[in-house]
Design a protein with these regions (language model features):
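Short, Lys/Arg-rich flexible segments
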Residues: 16-18, 35, 131, 138, ...
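Short, highly charged C-terminal tails/helix-capping segments
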Residues: 43-44, 141-156
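Hydrophobic/aromatic beta-strand elements that line small-molecule binding cavities or substrate pockets
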Residues: 8, 43-46, 67-71, 89-97
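Glycine-rich portal/gate segments that line the openings of hydrophobic small-molecule binding cavities
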Residues: 46-84
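Hydrophobic ligand-binding cavity/cleft-lining segments
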Residues: 1-45
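Beta-strand elements of well-folded, non-transmembrane domains
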Residues: 10-12, 30, 61-63, 110-114
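Beta-strand/loop substructures that line and gate deep hydrophobic ligand-binding cavities in soluble
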Residues: 83-135
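Hydrophobic residues positioned within well-ordered beta-strands of beta-sheet architectures
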Residues: 4-6, 55-57, 68, 91, ...
Length: 156
C-alpha cells in the first residue's frame, strides 16, 4: 500500500490571499470538476448524486479510468474514495490551520492492482504519483487564486 501526505501553505507572499471559505469553495468545485485543477486528469464527470455531500464521478487520470465516491465534510475535508479502477484507495484534501496560517494537505493511501506491496514497482508508482499530486496541489491553489481574483474583479 502506498501512503503519502503533503501539506502546503495556502497563502504565500506575492500571491492573492485566500480565506478558509474560498479554499473550501475551491475544493468543492474541484470535487465536481477537477479538470481546471489537476493537470494529469483528462476527463471528469459526476455520474450519481447520493446526497448534497456524497456523489460519484468517473475520471481519467494518467490515461486510466476510475470511479470515485466523493464525500464533502464542510468546511475542512473532501475525501475521494476510489471504488473502481486499477488503483483503489482513498485521497483526502484537508484545510488545516488558523485563518492566518491556512494549509492545504493532500493525503493518499492507495493499492495498485497486480503490484506487490513494498516492491520496487510499487515504489516507482508511488514516486510518480507523488510528483503528480504535488503538481495537483500547486495547480489547485493557483486555480483557487484565479477564481478568487475573478470574483473580486466582478464585485469591484
Amino acid at each position: 500500500m502506498i501512503f503519502v501526505t503533503h501539506q502546503l501553505p495556502v497563502n504565500v507572499p506575492g500571491q492573492p490571499s485566500l480565506s478558509r471559505q474560498q479554499v473550501w469553495d475551491g475544493l468543492v468545485l474541484k470535487a465536481n470538476n477537477a479538470l481546471p485543477f489537476v493537470p494529469s486528469m483528462s476527463y471528469c464527470e459526476v455520474t450519481q448524486r447520493h446526497s448534497d455531500t456524497i456523489f460519484d464521478r468517473d475520471i481519467d487520470f494518467r490515461g486510466e479510468r476510475f470511479t470515485e465516491r466523493i464525500t464533502l465534510e464542510q468546511p475542512h475535508r473532501v475525501t475521494f474514495t476510489r471504488i473502481a479502477g486499477p488503483v483503489l484507495g482513498t485521497i483526502a484534501n484537508e484545510i488545516e490551520g488558523a485563518a492566518d496560517d491556512l494549509r492545504l494537505r493532500f493525503s493518499f493511501a492507495l493499492v495498485v492492482a497486480g503490484v506487490e506491496g513494498g516492491s520496487a514497482q510499487e515504489q516507482e508508482y508511488a514516486d510518480s504519483m507523488t510528483g503528480d499530486y504535488l503538481k495537483a496541489v500547486a495547480a489547485t491553489l493557483n486555480a483557487m487564486r484565479r477564481i478568487a481574483e475573478q470574483k473580486n474583479a466582478v464585485s469591484a
